[in-house]
Design a protein with these regions (language model features):
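C-terminal extensions
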Residues: 1-157
Length: 157
């Protein structure tokens, strides 16, 4: 687990439970494929986390305005926004997130609309054909993602 308690009272490197909200605080630099120039342009506008990005660019008009102000392409910004949105789902991670993107699942609400069994099968077949990951996600993992997606608020339109 990436979140460790290193406080004296925590007893050393004890893994902490991660909640779905932790993805909100993911630094922009941890999202896949963020060029340094784009990260620095967003930092000028005080956007350094996924939560800040989703708050500032959750709808098309806001994305267009931020892209113009930060002098980045709307395509780059859209890609970061959808990756920040999916990062809210615990367990998706970079590789499985890219696999979901390839299957056209770009937002949390897209994931919520999926049938877990069908999505699991699609992910398995996709991974067998391109070997994007060492392993395909399990049915239990996919079911957990879809359940989380149902419980998360819609932040991207």
């Amino acid at each position: 687990m990436p979140y460790l308690d290193t406080s004296a009272s925590g007893g050393g490197n004890t893994p902490l439970r991660r909640t779905p909200r932790d993805g909100y605080n993911l630094p922009i630099s941890k999202l896949y494929g963020v060029p340094t120039r784009v990260r620095l342009a967003l930092k000028v506008h005080k956007i350094t986390t996924g939560a800040q990005l989703l708050a500032a660019a959750g709808n098309p008009a806001a994305r267009q305005l931020l892209a113009e102000r930060a002098r980045i392409t709307s395509t780059q910004l859209e890609l970061l926004v959808v990756r920040a949105d999916l990062a809210r789902v615990h367990g998706v991670g970079v590789v499985f997130g890219l696999m979901l993107e390839e299957l056209g699942i770009l937002k949390v609400q897209d994931l919520a609309a999926c049938d877990p069994h069908e999505l699991h099968d699609r992910l398995r077949r996709y991974n067998e054909s391109v070997r994007a990951a060492r392993r395909s996600p399990t049915l239990d993992e996919v079911q957990a993602w879809v359940a989380q997606a149902h419980s998360l608020p819609i932040l991207v339109t």
